[in-house]
Amino acid sequence: MNKNALFALLGALVLGFGIYWFNTPQGKVKIAPVPEVVSEVVRQGSMASYIKRDTPRNLPSFSFVDASGATKDVGVLKGKVTLLNLWATWCAPCRKEMPELAKLQREMGGADFQVVELSEDLKGYDTSAAFLKQVGAENLTLYSDDRAAALDAVKGPGLPITLLLNREGQEIGRLIGPAPWASDEAKALIRAAVDAK
């Protein structure tokens, strides 16, 4: 078989496969967007990884404990715009961003906004509280989830993951990984959430 005949045969096979593919059900499959569609991603600046949700999303159900050991659920996150940070003491990026989160709470925390730390550390509340004290972040509200159920419930790929919640306790955005939370860009995100009554 000469070269021209070989190329003609290969071309006919490719063409035939293409016609077959586009005329069968698998060739007509349309790719749908992910159900949890987001409307925008901040594409520049220090918050470039922040993902804003198209519509607020209810948090899945999970529980955690407070300083007294009392079990709480996501209902305690309602009432204020909340920056919910899931972290652990063994997570180096989590440790690095903690002073930024404490600074954000000092500068913007109050009647309308709060930073809440939800430790996924398997060593429990006391270990996490000791770390916050060590880095001067004891001004942050701390809860502990020593089963790491929250991380699984919010489908976090790893730590840290930070969720921005509206006053109804619904997720309106998230950032996976560390961020400079005391930056002007982060404060602008928080102000926009607070102003969206």
Predicted regions and their residues:
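A short beta-strand-turn-helix
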Residues: K52-P56, S61-T82
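Loop/turn elements at helix/coil->beta-strand transitions in domains of secreted/extracellular proteins
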Residues: G79-V81, A111-Q114, N139-L140
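Thiol/disulfide oxidoreductase modules built on the thioredoxin-like
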Residues: A130-N139, S144-D195
